[in-house]
Amino acid sequence: MQMWIDFFEGNLESAIYAYYDHPEIFEEWAELAEKLLVKQAEIYLSLKPDLLLLGGSGTITLASPELARKFALPAIKKICRLAKEAGILTMLHSCGKSMALLEMLTETDLNCVNPLEEPPMGDVNLAEVKRLYGKKMSLMGNLNTTSVMLKGSAADVEEAAKKAIDDAGKDGGFLLSTGDQCGRDTPEENIFTLVKTAKTYGKY
């Protein structure tokens, strides 16, 4: 849906209404968009990057799981397969609620997913995600960008970081990070505390 909302002046709600009114148009768009995305991926992969990043904002998860499976998953599958064949790692970024998306991603060759936001911004329980999907893909993120990083104390950051490591660090495959970006006014002390905690406790 993210590729299409510009046709509706950036209004995702209008785009979704239009889909239900004219599904045949969106199906044609989806076919063209998939070809474009796969071609772009082929060009990027030819440059031998260290990593190919997929996704964007939370539009994958603002749509229903049915729409995500119909319009997003096929392209993700093809691009991840191409990257795997080229020996390039892949990461998918999708803000917001992502539990339903994570289940779909197990059908792909994706290497890593982020930001795995906890409630209220997302719906991820990190320990549960590690149990369910930790052997299939690497996990990145989960520290709350607002209540912990922006508004919390350094002690709060250390506690949350240690918990994330405990929840998802066993046997590796976890990148300690914030759940999405740090807000503009995030205290520097909190950022440095996150780095220090990762260096101190992040050996797993």
What is each residue range found by the language model?
Residues 1-204:
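Active-site loop segments of alpha/beta catalytic cores
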